[in-house]
Amino acid sequence: MAASCMLRSSFISPGLPQLHHQSTSKPNNGIHFFTPIKATATNDAISQQKHRRPADENIREEARRHCSSHNFSARYVPFNAGPNSDEWYSLDEIVYRSRSGGLLDVQHDMDALKKFDGQYWRSLFDSRVGKTTWPYGSGVWSKKEWVLPEIDSDDIVSAFEGNSNLFWAERFGKQFLGMTDLWVKHCGISHTGSFKDLGMTVLVSQVNRLRKMHKPVVGVGCASTGDTSAALSAYCASAGIPSIVFLPANKISMAQLVQPIANGAFVLSIDTDFDGCMQLIREVTAELPIYLANSLNSLRLEGQKTAAIEILQQFDWEVPEWVIVPGGNLGNIYAFYKGFQMCKELGLVDRIPRLVCAQAANANPLYLHYKSGWKDFKPVKANTTFASAIQIGDPVSIDRAVFALQQCNGIVEEATEEELMDAMAQADSTGMFICPHTGVALTALFKLRNSGVIAPTDRTVVVSTAHGLKFTQSKIDYHSKEIKDMECRFANPPVEVKADFGSVMDVLKSYLLSQNSKL
């Protein structure tokens, strides 16, 4: 039986319904949950006084004070193993591949989770939204039972990541796509500015646990196209764990490069591409006690899957028709599938959305594989793309991505450099400020709308994976029309004008007339 901390205060929410046990059998005596009470104005005030943390007690001490136990568990198993496979590993083992050399997956004890019905889990997750109780203020750790159920809350390394904005892209959807129900899940609104935080909080928390268990881990390393290294270095710095980063020289933005440097990572700028860096970090972690943080390590996907759960939660547990995800190393498309599928299997929803994986045409091995009918996957040499984080020609999670897309009748699309930059500029013109990777996803949406695959009324979610502020140079180049062989149709360069009233008025009148003609 594993110990875990369930904070009493996180289960109390005004008007929250009672949580009922679904199973008719006797509950396991090792499971102890606090049942939410329906709060009134009076008992809510009493509750706030009762659960206020004493002045001399820190947030982790409060978590320990309200500690209880459960019998949920998880383990590593070979990815997509058959029912007769008996191979498995504890999450406390340092292992990245199965005996046959294949990928691993984190398998949860679904029988234990199914002892509680969908209404229970919906109410539990909803009751934690907006709380500061440790660690449930995090959008990842608010689903702790589904992520790393056996880790002690004292070992968790979190910046309360997740809980990212899901907003209605009304003007963009109506003006450019004729859509009325288009949404953007902005995972870039996070601690280090990308969705990688969701996975890194899980991985670094487990490393923190392993180091306390005196496992041979002297640091954590990754190959990166920018965002992974930013997340790794930040979370390792928070826990006082050394981080080692392999970056392809001159292939990431300065904003991405400065993040691991600022957070104290040991950064190696290597004269190769991401695939070359990935090969080197694999070889290094096989020889040195450095924990591998790339998505070959399936722990990260446990955190990333919570974005899918969060989308359902933000829609009041209604399922959208489509979710479009940019894809490079391809772990995220599988993570989204896994999150949606867990919600279906545990009764929170009755179906899952169709997934679309969007790739840059300059790095499109999954797209080519999809167009061939999933026959004979071949890596490609990734060419330079403005969507630098997905400039990957030999994705680690290809098998995971294919499985996910086949299970949900998914689609793969691609975007040329001009298409993705135009889409980014169009989105920005309606009040967004997106990254080029989101431009790839929006291009996929344009194509699927134009072909009639996605209907104008289909509820569709585009996953924005990073913050646009990481990619300002690409936006400057576009609006300055300085990109070779690109028309930059939606560029909006500044207008140079003399410093006198008449010149300014002439320019303004011309601008206002042009705007009026568009009405």
Swiss-Prot record:
Residues that bind pyridoxal 5'-phosphate: G328, N329, L330, G331, N332, T465
Species the sequence originates in: Solanum tuberosum
Listed cofactors: pyridoxal 5'-phosphate
PROSITE patterns the record matches: DEHYDRATASE_SER_THR (PS00165)
Tree of life domain: Eukaryota
Keyword vocabulary terms for this entry: Allosteric enzyme, Amino-acid biosynthesis, Chloroplast, Lyase, Plastid, Pyridoxal phosphate, S-adenosyl-L-methionine, Threonine biosynthesis, Transit peptide
Protein family per UniProt: Belongs to the threonine synthase family.
Catalytic activity: O-phospho-L-homoserine + H2O = L-threonine + phosphate
Entry-linked Gene3D superfamilies: 3.40.50.1100
A Pfam family the protein falls into: PALP
Gene Ontology biological-process annotations: cysteine biosynthetic process; threonine biosynthetic process
EC numbers on record: 4.2.3.1
Protein name (Swiss-Prot/TrEMBL): Threonine synthase, chloroplastic
